[in-house]
């Protein structure tokens, strides 16, 4: 195997040393990157099986495990190897380990992936250990690992080289395991509640369902400009119209060609659903049940930490109409204000810089964002939105300037947006045409009317409640993550050259 002469001729540069060891290994053992290795159990399974093994007890049980080497002590006599779910100590000694296996030890570096067969014991100090009988090189790592206990200190590098971040940061690793569990939990909850999951187009010839700047591309064969979807709403409503199901949902990515922040990524995950014969109050109940279920699955309780706060996903959540919240915060009674001009005057008198063409509803929503949003720390539903900014929602009976819409807030973040969906085809067309004219006035000349959707709604859409949940923000809360980039495996970032 590796003689002293080979060791003594190795370079002092860490990367070069690994390359030289790889060359020696190829010469001495042949295949250094085998296609297959059979484990008898994972590290986690091993730990669970022998959790009651007493200290200083050695079994005759022989197991085979594999993992990445995270630490090596006493010239490889003690090594810790990790797989995705656990750590096991490997012990190699002349009394228990054949010479052929021990001869491989000088060639093993931190970061290499090895397979080990041996007997199970627990040391006097209580460490579950395998006495190595055979050691197999499975992957020779050509680059040193970052320092295990501190991980990557450069935040941008953590996002650029997420594989190293997860490799060296147990918090990051756990967070993405929890993300997977949350996504599964959303799907399981929705299916158990009778919803059918569908997939709607990511590439759309007409974008809609939200107000946002899309990413544009071109289909060469069809000779057609297309857009990455900004929302699945109109296709999900067409599915509801079809009668395929009365309860439909989708969990998938949306794309918006807009800014990047701690709460915004241009590619993000949404859960959107539509429930026939329900209204926005039914959807509020659904949100509360879903959030409580997810908190219990991750934390075992509805209360959990976020930063220096304790959040509670135990329903019912606080419910407050937007005009009432603004009146309480500022003293401005928007229900008593009759015209757009009066709304602008009242807003300016209270010190708010509003635009000269803003409507009553735009003034109300702006003041809410400025004065109320930041106070919504515990989960809250804000209801009764202005119709001006809610083109797809039904009017509140007796209050035609307001609609049956709510947004769910927590930690001052918007987590969800829901409506009693507009299903009057004539009113829907009028509002969509008005929205299109506003978009064109803003310079969004590519925005088009979705005639296929309007044709479908002419066929008749049942009354329904609709909901969109920002899954990434919800995961941020449930995993105590300060930035959306901490919960997206490979977030958007500037190129390395920038």
Swiss-Prot record:
The gene is lysS. Mg(2+) 1 binds at residues 407, 414. Binds 3 Mg(2+) ions per subunit. Mg(2+) 2 binds at residue 414. It comes from Rhizobium johnstonii (strain DSM 114642 / LMG 32736 / 3841) (Rhizobium leguminosarum bv. viciae). This is Lysine--tRNA ligase. It catalyses: tRNA(Lys) + L-lysine + ATP = L-lysyl-tRNA(Lys) + AMP + diphosphate. GO terms for molecular function: ATP binding; lysine-tRNA ligase activity; magnesium ion binding; tRNA binding. Its cofactor is Mg(2+).
